[in-house]
Amino acid sequence: MGFLKPTMAILFLAMVAVSSAVDMSIISYDEKHGVSTTGGRSEAEVMSIYEAWLVKHGKAQSQNSLVEKDRRFEIFKDNLRFVDEHNEKNLSYRLGLTRFADLTNDEYRSKYLGAKMEKKGERRTSLRYEARVGDELPESIDWRKKGAVAEVKDQGGCGSCWAFSTIGAVEGINQIVTGDLITLSEQELVDCDTSYNEGCNGGLMDYAFEFIIKNGGIDTDKDYPYKGVDGTCDQIRKNAKVVTIDSYEDVPTYSEESLKKAVAHQPISIAIEAGGRAFQLYDSGIFDGSCGTQLDHGVVAVGYGTENGKDYWIVRNSWGKSWGESGYLRMARNIASSSGKCGIAIEPSYPIKNGENPPNPGPSPPSPIKPPTQCDSYYTCPESNTCCCLFEYGKYCFAWGCCPLEAATCCDDNYSCCPHEYPVCDLDQGTCLLSKNSPFSVKALKRKPATPFWSQGRKNIA
């Protein structure tokens, strides 16, 4: 016990040091120490900040080679310099070391933002929220304070922002009409809404509204939880229609006044251009930085207001609570361009709900248990595993291993395997790459021996 107390004290001091390093990375060095940011920090000091950032964002174990770590460190240093130079200008918004601080802007855009998608067919533009002379709207509104906005969520590395934007708007109108804030399932949209939308490869909110209407409702996040990967549609959960909507409409385009009128009545799905470096590293304040109108990210407008004479929108993102203002962004409102900041007024849309949800049918039956994955007549792996041959001769496999992922890549070393999102095996580094020569990698998984079933193998074959 005598050894335990000093150890705990050392750990506590280390944690304080880490916390201080992270805080220092967000406040300019000039403010804290009175020296120039450019060249003001030593290499060791920046490395300390970087190591603390890795721990904070759970990336400490994600770099599997010194070359990769050195490359990420150089990118981090450049982003840190960009953050400090911006914050020294005392503008309306501040930057910080977000979860994207070790990515170049090209990497950030290619991994976390979807390609621009054009809606097929005409928009359902309605005059319901068209701005008119004489409209009396509140000076500010925040649907979070009215209980119509669920907790900030995190889409992860899946390009499913469209699903989070859709669900956020549906959760909002459902609470406004029924009084119940029910957290709904983005994963159901990712898995099941595949007629036009493409799961982790992008989609549009209007198509997702159409899916919910045609399906007769959508399930809860609790019963159909988010996984962050494309999956097979669970038909039983798809038929659990907990929350319904009756229709959807589009806000008149290129009109921030019409968008204001819409947001005064309910949370609104919006699309914006989020690919700029300042957006990548946004920390707080009213964002009025450089951005265009190449819409590549779906979010939710949940309010608006004014601070020190500057109008803003309140926007809920889907990158977790560590990004921005606890997961939110304030964007400049009433700018000179009719498209709004970052194109916010180009494609806003919203669900319509006229009445209560269907009666609660009680607990739904669990989804059927999937059978084991069958490797051949003599070996099986657990459900949702991939069979990988351990020993083969000619065309025959004499021993099987199990990779604990669906649709995995079996590496040629007969020992490891890779997720289907990172299908390229790097046997030298023991990692899986997003593509050949890609900077993005994860650690390769080990196979486990398959289960033999000598006596009943043939009996179980369908």
UniProtKB/Swiss-Prot annotation:
GO biological process, one term: regulation of stomatal closure
SUPFAM superfamilies: Cysteine proteinases (SSF54001), Granulin repeat (SSF57277)
Keyword Signal appears in the UniProt entry: yes
Mechanisms controlling activity: Inhibited by the cysteine protease inhibitor E64 (L-trans-epoxysuccinyl-leucylamide-(4-guanido)-butane).
Protein keywords: Cytoplasm, Disulfide bond, Glycoprotein, Golgi apparatus, Hydrolase, Protease, Signal, Thiol protease, Vacuole
Record-level GO cellular component terms: apoplast; cytoplasm; cytoplasmic stress granule; Golgi apparatus; nucleus; P-body; plant-type vacuole; plasma membrane
Sites where a glycan is attached: 90, 414
Source organism superkingdom: Eukaryota
Catalytic-site annotation from UniProt: 161, 297, 317
Residue ranges annotated as propeptide in the record: 22-136, 353-462
InterPro entries linked to this entry: Granulin, Granulin_sf, Papain-like_cys_pep_sf, Pept_asp_AS, Pept_cys_AS, Pept_his_AS, Peptidase_C1A, Peptidase_C1A_C
CDD domains in the record: Peptidase_C1A
Signal peptide positions on this chain: 1-21
Outcome of mutating residue 297 to A: Loss of protease activity
Cysteines paired by S-S bonds: 158-200, 192-233, 291-342, 375-387, 381-402
EC category name: hydrolase
Record Pfam families: Granulin, Inhibitor_I29, Peptidase_C1
EC numbers for this chain: 3.4.22.-
Entry GO MF terms: cysteine-type peptidase activity; peptidase activity
Entry keyword annotation includes Protein transport: no
Subcellular location: Vacuole; Golgi apparatus; Cytoplasm, Stress granule; Cytoplasm, P-body
Induction: By high salt conditions and drought stress.
PANTHER family per the UniProt record, alphabetical: CYSTEINE PROTEASE FAMILY C1-RELATED (PTHR12411)
Complex and partners: Interacts with SERPIN1. Interacts with PRN2. Interacts with WSCP. Interacts with TZF4, TZF5 and TZF6.
Record function comment: Cysteine protease that plays a role in immunity, senescence, and biotic and abiotic stresses. Involved in immunity against the necrotrophic fungal pathogen Botrytis cinerea. Involved in elicitor-stimulated programmed cell death (PCD). During infection by the necrotrophic fungal pathogen Botrytis cinerea, functions as a PCD-promoting protease that is released from the ER body or vacuole to the cytoplasm. Accumulates in endoplasmic reticulum-derived bodies in epidermal cells and may participate in cell death in stressed or injured cells.
Protein name: Cysteine proteinase RD21A
